[in-house]
Amino acid sequence: MLTRSASYPDRETAQWATQQVVTANEQAIHRWLAQNTRARLTVEAAWPSREEPVGRVQLEGDLLAGRGPVDVRAARVVLRREPSSPLGFVVHTTVPFYL
């Protein structure tokens, strides 16, 4: 069941946010790769003092109440193991995230 919808304003912002999340979670990513257990890893980061939002999120409850989407300054990235990738993983998905 879909409870929210989210989007980045443009490709540049999506790439920036994704790279920032990966960089901020570098140690967790290295541990995940070393443990060789789960196929995917979800990591997040937030930039509350960032002037520009990284995206917009529409929550189902807000939509039903007649409210529009909200600007957000956080992102969630899902990584997937990929042995053929130089880093050992690829980005499965990335979305702006409402904290």
Locate predicted features:
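Functional cores of ribonucleases/endoribonucleases
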Residues: 1-99
